């Protein structure tokens, strides 16, 4: 884990995302690193503590950028990565929305 002080943000984000992915295979489940894949074995999402942020990597969004809710623009870094830091509250509804939209793309990327 690159920064233990971000563990509370990571845990909060995981608690938001995990129920939306409960039927998908979990590849890694360690403190600070959680990876989920599709039933066919493609990467789906990764939630990982980095040096200065908690990153949410949403692979379907890389191929289908139109699924990104505009409410998440302030957190977007790159094509399919969201960064969460201590200074901003987690956008619970935005996270739920992006995971639901990404699930609809399973099998199309």
Regions found by a protein language model. Give the residues of each.
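Charge-dense, helix-prone N-terminal extensions
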Residues: 1-109
């Amino acid at each position: 884990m690159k920064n233990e002080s971000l563990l509370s943000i990571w845990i909060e984000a995981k608690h938001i995302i995990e129920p939306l992915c409960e039927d998908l295979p979990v590849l890694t489940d360690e403190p600070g690193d959680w990876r989920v894949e599709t039933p066919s074995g493609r990467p789906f999402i990764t939630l990982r503590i980095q040096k200065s942020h908690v990153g949410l990597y949403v692979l379907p969004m890389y191929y289908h950028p139109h699924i990104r809710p505009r409410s998440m623009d302030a957190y977007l870094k790159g094509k399919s990565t969201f960064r969460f830091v201590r200074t901003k509250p987690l956008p619970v509804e935005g996270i739920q929305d992006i995971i639901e939209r990404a699930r609809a793309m399973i099998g199309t990327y």
